[in-house]
Amino acid sequence: MNVINIEHLTHSFTERLLFDDVSFYLSDKDKVGVIGINGTGKSTLLKIIAGKETADRADIIMQRDLRIAYLPQIPEFADTHTTLSGALPLTEEISDQPENYIPQAKSMLHQLGFTRYDQPITELSGGQRKRIALVRT
């Protein structure tokens, strides 16, 4: 069963054509790797699939109950974020109050090896920040 069908994907980035009428599908059993040299559109393709970026042209059909999370290469956090606040969903993307997510976020952070929830994001390594961003997705 196909969970994603993409047809006629065309997209440019600053005058450079990244995708020219590309079509493909992913089934529920597929495991896919996206490989290529720097600047060929790997991250852009994933952002388009996740709905974080809009293609110049594409017909994208996804299974109705499909949930997609996108974890950027370099997660962005405010300098004021702590381990816990950085793990909470972004308030403009959720309908509930962030406080409703605190117990689940703490549990997931603990599973990933975090014990201090008040530690400033600025004190964490890139890998630690990526794990916090994973909790947020």
Model feature map: region roles:
Residues 2, 8, 66-68, 73-132, ...:
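ABC-family P-loop ATPase nucleotide-binding domains
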Residues 50:
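Helix-to-loop junction immediately C-terminal to a conserved catalytic motif
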Residues 56-64:
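ABC nucleotide-binding domain "signature motif"
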Residues 8-10, 21-24, 59:
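Conserved N-terminal beta-strand of ABC nucleotide-binding domains
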Residues 35-37:
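The feature captures the beta-strand-to-loop junction immediately N-terminal to the Walker
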